[in-house]
Amino acid sequence: PVHQGGLRSELLAMTMQQVYEKINDTGEMFSENAADVIAAVERKELSRLQKSQIHANFAYIEPDDSYFDLTFRREYKRRAFDAVFRHLDTRSMFGKGPRVGAGVWFDENREAKGGRTLAGVAYIPGASALCAEDGLVYGNKWADARPEGKVGDIGPWLALAAQLIPDPVERAHILNVMAYKRQHPSVKINHAILLIGDPGIGKDSFYAPFLYSIGGRAQRNAHIAKGDEFSSQFTYGLENEVIVLNELRQPEGKDRRAMENHLKPIIAAPPDTLTIERKGLHPYDMVNRMFVLAFTNDPVPLSLPSQDRRWFCVWSHAPRMDKDAARALWTWYKKQGGLEAVGRWLMDRNVSAFNPAAMPPWTDYRSRLIE
């Protein structure tokens, strides 16, 4: 899509950084209440808006009768919009000027205040707050949450990588995938990564810095999917740059084939768009730029066709991580700058030779999954 002029990217980045700095670090990586903490901070920021600033910070979404926050890229239904700004003295410009909800006041003054109307919303990684297609303007729900990171020693993480994936070619490919996604949010990596191994060997620990590099400690723009999530009527989980499939497995052969078919449009493009079904709101088509990462302990979690081009599959024979080693690694991650150092390394890694559209390299383990 063609990008329309919206908020200046440097001002948006500065505002978002100021907000993130107000979030207290609890020391918990991806804690369950992280989203609640961020939402509370955002509500506090909204309450500080003056009435004169609202039209510059919001746009009206026509099909949903709702309002789009151009800073935090969130959608508010009319009732929620009224509630958030109920503290403001919003009065109608008609009659004797009775007090009205913030939504009505916004609508009445939209033209005079230079407010925007949108044809809908979108989720387009790498794009600005306002995007256009076929002459229509959309509000982009994606906002860059990548931390800058800090240059430092990443030896503990590279040691874990070598332990999990001893083959240097396979390991280099996975590192390139992570670095490319960190550096290029607007580009689809047209295959998924599947890492198989025994429980407790450090699969989650290995990929944690990558997820941090995409969305910070709050893990924005990354989603850990539940087992039956993609069979749900609503598909909010697709509104992410990275989708993690934990414990990928289907015991029956027919179910393994069905799952592989179900994941095809998510893993690779085309299709160039995916439909997001939303409760109480109109569905919309998001741009298919997500990357899929899967873990499993099952030696045969899915069945692949002989012509498969969508999966890079690695079997790790690493032993279970020692508890003290795991504790030391996570202490380094959370308290000694490990997450920031790995995130920065991924940002700086040279991936100029990596082709995100190419078929992934063949692995011995992938041949075992082919029917």
Positions of the model-derived regions?
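N-terminal nucleic-acid engagement/recognition segments and initiation subdomains in replication
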Residues: 2-170, 186, 235-238, 300, ...
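P-loop NTPase catalytic core of nucleic-acid-dependent motor ATPases
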Residues: 127-248, 259-260, 312-315, 346
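Conserved catalytic/switch belt of AAA+ P-loop NTPases
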Residues: 215, 258-284
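AAA+/SF3 P-loop NTPase mechanochemical coupling elements
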Residues: 232-238, 276-295
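Conserved AAA+/SF3 P-loop NTPase catalytic/coupling segment centered on the Walker-B
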Residues: 241-268, 301-307
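Conserved nucleotide-binding/hydrolysis micro-motifs of P-loop NTPases
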Residues: 249-250, 297-301, 317-322
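Signature of the SF2 helicase/ATPase Hel1-core->accessory helical subdomain module
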Residues: 264-271, 300, 318, 346
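Phosphate-sensing "switch" segment of ASCE/P-loop ATPases
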Residues: 285-290, 304-371
